Amino acid sequence: MGDEDWEAEILKPHVSSYVPVFEKDKYSSGANGDTFNRTSASSDIGESSKKENTSTTGGFGRGKGFGNRGFLNNKFEEGDSSGFWKESNNDCEDNQTRSRGFSKRGGCQDGNDSEASGPFRRGGRGSFRGCRGGFGLGRPNSESDQDQGTQRGGGLFGSRKPAASDSGNGDTYQSRSGSGRGGYKGLNEEVVTGSGKNSWKSETEGGESSDSQGPKVTYIPPPPPEDEDSIFAHYQTGINFDKYDTILVEVSGHDAPPAILTFEEANLCQTLNNNIAKAGYTKLTPVQKYSIPIVLAGRDLMACAQTGSGKTAAFLLPILAHMMRDGITASRFKELQEPECIIVAPTRELINQIYLEARKFSFGTCVRAVVIYGGTQFGHSVRQIVQGCNILCATPGRLMDIIGKEKIGLKQVKYLVLDEADRMLDMGFGPEMKKLISCPGMPSKEQRQTLLFSATFPEEIQRLAGDFLKSSYLFVAVGQVGGACRDVQQTILQVGQYSKREKLVEILRNIGDERTMVFVETKKKADFIATFLCQEKISTTSIHGDREQREREQALGDFRCGKCPVLVATSVAARGLDIENVQHVINFDLPSTIDEYVHRIGRTGRCGNTGRAISFFDTDSDNHLAQPLVKVLSDAQQDVPAWLEEIAFSTYVPPSFSSSTRGGAVFASVDTRKNYQGKHTLNTAGISSSQAPNPVDDESWD
């Protein structure tokens, strides 16, 4: 029909919309232009348009693509970048609903032409859902739809109002149709009119897919090994493990139970004792000596202990002992699973690590641990839970999704554990944690036992913890280690921003193949530095929050096995990760807080092993860390560079900057409750007492 009269199409809604004719079963072709051009002859499109179309990614001129929603009855499953849905069933029938439009909001207009106006300002968007503006054709699903006389999605080309509406001001065609979505409604889609936006809903599994959530996650992590040797593979303790006995421990609160010296004193069941022995645990660490009897006594606990000191076992063992003694309620034969224990951690890698520890200690018992986290298929998480769940290990986002979709009940929760609790209660996850304890069915803090563990507990975090803990909770502070582990040799180098890469390569070449973690501040920089090191012939991988879960797990696997001895990471890997034989940590970028510095360098020097941490200090951006760094180095009996001391004494730090830089403080984190009774300070062997620290001010590191 030659050049189409676009004005007539716009201003005369009774004229039927032009719909290009497609050959059946050929929507899966690669480029939009190719598919369209095969039918352009029958559609009276000129040869010149055809040539122009083939030179771009879309149809009808440069910068635009012809899109196709395809068959919305699960006939098309995968989309490509061109806007077509790849066909998974060759038996698609013509009477299925189809909806097509011109993409890139272009219509016949160049999508990049900012001078366009009037009806050509916006056309349709032809990718999935018919999208905004443009020509769309909705074929009814049944004859009754035609008889009802109502159009199901939109009406005029470019009209924001429903087709059944007669109101308008003459230039409604410049807006969008169907409440902001062009064309007509397609199959399995709800269009809600009356507002400027369209509420679109698709019949997808679990309701995960939405406009804002992006593509549906299909990744299912491989199951962990089931053989006993793999389950009980353990971390070898280092030469300094016995030095833990010299660390001071402060327990504050009323009527704290006495510490234990051996696992036998805990009176655990024989199965647990056997699993402890298989895991290679022969001696209690300081946090375990005090935390295990406190949890066994049913008391709420806030425990602060150095990185790599066995905090996970300190809460898992007594919880499992309670479950073995009191019995469990969850069963795979129950329709709704109601876990007795919920453990929450801030990162996927850490919560998976906790799950593996829970599976290890519960081996051969009736207790079943389950782990769920984001980046994996939602249905997979549900399937794991319905098989039986006594201990639920979860990241905050996936946990709230599971609760919101009523896949678990909370009435039986007896134990709530927040690992890396300072991170869980800050502005990052604090609101979600408050939602958790406010969920219907969740027992109040007086009816459950709440345990908080971390290597650092700033004062403001302790105040927030009051919403989670009973007022009679006990506080355990393990020694002077909230600053840094003494088994880590710390080195601070003064390196400018533009000299860091050269210095990093120099250090890594001297290190050789020893396992090294390099921390940077941003996700983009993590990939950039990893690529740069690979170009320098240094095998490197990276991990950060923007990588898919499959890629994150692959990166960790390559790092653990030594395939890539260098791992460039953001703070997603700074907390809790227990990777054997990490000899070096390099802070390419120093973090914004000293607490994060402590967690980062804690990836090495674990369980009595020695390690080395090197940090690049940029005087243009890191001066705020000078004073707390001097304090951390001094407390860990490390050499403090003279230039760093000079910067520290010349830099003003607000009084509220740090709770751990208290003058003369013995403990890096102390109980902030005022006028409490029963505070006592002991060495970890429990033989003698030492004088409690002097009162300190209210400075804060955070």
Swiss-Prot record:
Gene Ontology terms for molecular function: ATP binding; ATP hydrolysis activity; nucleic acid binding; RNA helicase activity
SMART domains on file: DEXDc, HELICc
Keyword Hydrolase: yes
Chain positions found as Phosphoserine: S195, S199, S700
Biased composition (Polar residues): 29-46, 141-150, 195-215, 681-693
Main location: cytoplasm
Reaction it catalyzes: ATP + H2O = ADP + phosphate + H(+)
Keyword terms: ATP-binding, Cytoplasm, Developmental protein, Differentiation, Helicase, Hydrolase, Meiosis, Nucleotide-binding, Phosphoprotein, Repeat, RNA-mediated gene silencing, Spermatogenesis
Domain Helicase C-terminal: 503-648
Subcellular location: Cytoplasm; Cytoplasm, Perinuclear region
Pfam families: DEAD, Helicase_C
Similarity section: Belongs to the DEAD box helicase family. DDX4/VASA subfamily.
Function (record text): ATP-dependent RNA helicase required during spermatogenesis to repress transposable elements and preventing their mobilization, which is essential for the germline integrity. Acts via the piRNA metabolic process, which mediates the repression of transposable elements during meiosis by forming complexes composed of piRNAs and Piwi proteins and governs the methylation and subsequent repression of transposons. Involved in the secondary piRNAs metabolic process, the production of piRNAs in fetal male germ cells through a ping-pong amplification cycle.
Protein name: ATP-dependent RNA helicase DDX4
Native source species: Mus musculus (Mouse)
Gene designation: Ddx4
